[in-house]
Amino acid sequence: MKNTNLPEETKEPISPGSSHRKQNKTGTKTCFPETTVLSGRDRLKRHREEVAGKVPIPDSWGKEGLLMGWMDFSTFDAAFTSSQIVSARAALMADSGDDAGARGSRPQRLRVESSC
């Protein structure tokens, strides 16, 4: 039974000692480029070298004000120093201090048991 789904050149049997690379009708080999696996750092370095001098980098991009506004942490700092958070922290510290007399002079330590 003849397989008609494959192209004519792939129907030829491959001998055990031959290369798996195909030869075209003229007898020259079609070479596949050797692929090397590059790390991300090597690919970035190669890309930087390839585009060096071809990509203009502006001195300013016109949106620096937005960047500075985004980096402003004053709204977050105000939320973290609110009186509610400070009073909650003080209440937790007071709760832990109330039981210290019942346990002795040493505070209770958290015990972590191995699950292995």
Swiss-Prot record:
GO terms for cellular component: nucleus. Disruption phenotype: No visible phenotype. Bic1 and bic2 double mutants have a blue light-hypersensitive short-hypocotyl phenotype and an increased anthocyanin accumulation when grown in continuous blue light. It comes from the Eukaryota. It is found in: Nucleus. GO terms for biological process: blue light signaling pathway. Its main location: nucleus. Coiled coil: none annotated. Residues 1-33, 95-116 are annotated as: Disordered. Keywords: Nucleus. Regulates the blue-light dependent dimerization of CRY2 and formation of photobodies. Inhibits CRY phosphorylation. This is Protein BIC2. The gene is BIC2.
